[in-house]
Amino acid sequence: MEEADLTLPLSQDTFHDLWNNVFLSTENESLAPPEGLLSQNMDFWEDPETMQETKNVPTAPTVPAISNYAGEHGFNLEFNDSGTAKSVTSTYSVKLGKLFCQLAKTTPIGVLVKEEPPQGAVIRATSVYKKTEHVGEVVKRCPHHQSEDLSDNKSHLIRVEGSQLAQYFEDPNTRRHSVTVPYERPQLGSEMTTILLSFMCNSSCMGGMNRRPILTILTLETTEGEVLGRRCFEVRVCACPGRDRKTEEGNLEKSGTKQTKKRKSAPAPDTSTAKKSKSASSGEDEDKEIYTLSIRGRNRYLWFKSLNDGLELMDKTGPKIKQEIPAPSSGKRLLKGGSDSD
């Protein structure tokens, strides 16, 4: 009886239901993922998120600020006094606020703070063009120097030397380059921390800076990207830093001397035209008005002076002399010996 109850009567409807159950079960089994595949996919999506959190870079402004800001921590920089000798590889001019250095040569820069920054603070270095017409462009190395470099950061102009903790970034929005290094407290007996920077392209390189002046910005930042202090200085990468510094400082002194002389002296009149100065009385005749004429060269000045003295003398005795001189009878004829040529 039990076997009879378990067996269903074989008909067209029961066979159709049985066939559908068999087909759906095999289809579901074929679509089911292999064991452990779902967990592997979850691990795959979790790793990039954690990597992005560890390498999170704060969004940089479109145009970085170039004003000096000491902040609450008294952030400041100090450069070595290398002088203007031809043998120096880097030298800083206080008068110009400008660093002169050679290509790929290490430049030590001292970092000073009055109060220690928070734990994990970093020092960020980036460069921008000085002139407003170029400030929107990214400062990077020329194609020639990039082709000679096989490193991952070959397009970056600024390198940090002597530290394995340096990190190089490229902002996803502005494409500007920057490099960070962790802030280290000064050693015993020292008031500052020294970082080593090198600039990997000349200022005159075609396709790179192309003789356009640049500014380097050093900022003291927290791990979240908050700026605690900022210092800015101009940089020129050249073959002879001492010579170029001496030349530019000399040009600055010459321009300053010329401006001082111009302020002390009266404004020079225009040499192309004679400027008419107003006379003391506005009712005087036009012939009595005084004019000023600037003359170049002493000999020419003496010649005009003698001419002017003669004219002044004629003005004093003018009426008598004019009466004694006979006028010609015609504009085309000259009087010779007091008789007509006819």
Curated annotation (Swiss-Prot):
Keywords: Activator, Apoptosis, Cell cycle, Cytoplasm, DNA-binding, Metal-binding, Nucleus, Phosphoprotein, Transcription, Transcription regulation, Tumor suppressor, Zinc. Residues 236-243 are annotated as: Interaction with DNA. Residues 288-317 are annotated as: Oligomerization. A motif (Nuclear export signal) lies at residues 302-313. A motif (Bipartite nuclear localization signal) lies at residues 261-278. The record marks 86 as: Interaction with DNA. Belongs to the p53 family. This is Cellular tumor antigen p53. The lineage of its organism: Eukaryota, Metazoa, Chordata, Craniata, Vertebrata. The gene is tp53.
